[in-house]
């Protein structure tokens, strides 16, 4: 058991080390450094502590050597520990490709061939992906349970019987009723979703426009975004009001408790929709179209079609969270651009790695609601493995964004550090398998994406 845990730590550390090298190469972090050191393995001339580019080049090669030693140690421990065949295969592939990667890096450093850096970076991502797969499969074998009994077709629990006890709540003053009603309408808008989705849109705008971004565009886009999120949340409350009564987590929602009548909630949702689309239209027509698409997708396609009918609801539903990236980019640029699409892909891939943690924590609640969430239908072991899959894919997509944009060291460092925190929280989730561990990984996922989006905004606007 101790040897297995040692191997898990080495494998996770190796994956993070490889990712550090990938992000450094994907962003502009090494652009000047490559020109400052065109020999290999050492740089010509004495080390100049005032030459930042030269120090970065030296640092990159030293880190590559250290990660190489880590790869060797991890491979030796892993192959000796008796891990399963596919884990061994993934380790061997990554370990064999690593010296090839070093050799290719040497050629890149000493050659002017423009196609080689791309191949060097792609190979690095492949090595990282190989180690992530090895980690996912090893954790599954180490911590998985054969005693799980997934429910293929979860049936909603009966709606709780009404309480006929007379209401003895003291009469409220007009001010108390007003505050309570306003608070209930605010809850309909799902305000907890707003900060992160607005950050997604802000990152899209920053990437598209850089320092030419105008305050008017920001205010109109984020204002429309807040209102569209509120509209989507309100319609979701209306459509799931009966199911909300069956779930502990949602049984106190305003419509489920009849605090707000359905008719009033629908009117409120429509008002928010029209207001958001009007603000989006002030930016441009395509932003308004994307905003309407986001509202319809979340309110109708996700809530009525995907969520109650397919185990892939979380994956496919990630499109709703990805749309703000395109909205932000189009608001600043006027058309859809490839970096904006890649940012949307990052959010799409991040969503399962993020939300599956919540699905684990509220597994019984989702089963009571009749939702075929991954932990309910496929089991907790499979769900934890998929979290690692999607986390690895998210990090690779983040590397691709670095290639397509002039993002630099701040983005690279943030993505690596917070990605490592997120990954380790997921490793602990596999080991502990508790509700607290699921919430820890959930919050780590929020911290990762929030920090990366802030880094994008700062990098694009200020650095």
Swiss-Prot record:
Region (Protoheme IX prenyltransferase): 194-460
Gene Ontology biological process: heme O biosynthetic process
Membrane topology: Multi-pass membrane protein
Region (Disordered): 144-170
The entry's keywords: Cell membrane, Heme biosynthesis, Membrane, Transferase, Transmembrane, Transmembrane helix
Pathway(s) where this gene product acts: Porphyrin-containing compound metabolism; heme O biosynthesis; heme O from protoheme: step 1/1
CDD domains associated with the record: PT_UbiA_Cox10
Subcellular localization, as worded in the UniProt entry: Cell membrane
GO CC, alphabetical: plasma membrane
Region (Unknown): 1-193
Annotated InterPro entries: Protohaem_IX_farnesylTrfase (IPR006369), UbiA_prenyltransferase (IPR000537), UbiA_sf (IPR044878)
Transmembrane helix as UniProt keyword: yes
Documented EC number(s): 2.5.1.141
The protein's enzyme class: transferase
Membrane in keyword set: yes
Membrane-spanning ranges: 6-26, 54-74, 89-109, 115-135, 193-213, 218-238, 265-285, 286-306, 314-334, 336-356, 387-407, 409-429, 441-461
Stated family: In the C-terminal section; belongs to the UbiA prenyltransferase family. Protoheme IX farnesyltransferase subfamily.
Miscellaneous notes: Carbon 2 of the heme B porphyrin ring is defined according to the Fischer nomenclature.
NCBIfam families: cyoE_ctaB, PRK04375.1-2
Job of this protein: Converts heme B (protoheme IX) to heme O by substitution of the vinyl group on carbon 2 of heme B porphyrin ring with a hydroxyethyl farnesyl side group.
Annotated protein name in UniProt: Protoheme IX farnesyltransferase
Organism from which the protein derives: Haloarcula marismortui (strain ATCC 43049 / DSM 3752 / JCM 8966 / VKM B-1809)
Gene coding for it: ctaB
